[in-house]
Amino acid sequence: MATNAANRTNIFSFIPKSISSEVFLVWLINYLDSDCKYGQYKQSFFDNLLLKRDDKGKLVSEISINRQSNNMETVLSFHFNASDERQDILLLFVDKESDMVRPEQLDRYKWIYPNCYRYIYYKTGYVTTIEEQTVSQNQYDLVTDGMMESVLESISELHPLIRIYTDYLNSEVEAFNYYHERLFLNHDKEILHDSAAQKYLLDTLLENIAEDNWSIKIE
């Protein structure tokens, strides 16, 4: 598979994805905040990914990041238009190989970090409809690889590392499109020798069973 071949030359393919996503985003935000010449790119990144729709365009300042060691959460703090009120965003990084975070866990994070400006659930990899519904019902905002790739594409030429990470996300998105085509359009059972394809198939079947949808067919 071409996508897997491309990934073997990408540094991010050698790190657990939830860790690489967190480390990259922490680096990126600090990088964009390091020099005023990046101001418009920082604002674009916040507008397109982190701010609520009604707050897009508000200037972001006094950024700080608090990473929680041995946990999946990172707290991003900032101020609007140099105001005194601090805004906190809780970012949860969920690995593609892990089960989705359960509702009680999502509630627990809200109890630990109350009154956040936003609660963001960043799932690296395939997101089932069930997982998407669980995240929404618990009032978290879902961010996917495809969404992140789209946001980063506009600033990817700023630094080689941004381009590398964007390419990696693109290869991950293409992989799931590839599995879907081979399994459900071409009815190719040989792809099931790939463990990632097996996981994609199981997730898809569980999702359709939960929705009482029996239209999936592999000949």
Label every PLM stretch briefly.
Residues 1-219:
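Charged, terminal alpha-helix-loop-beta segments
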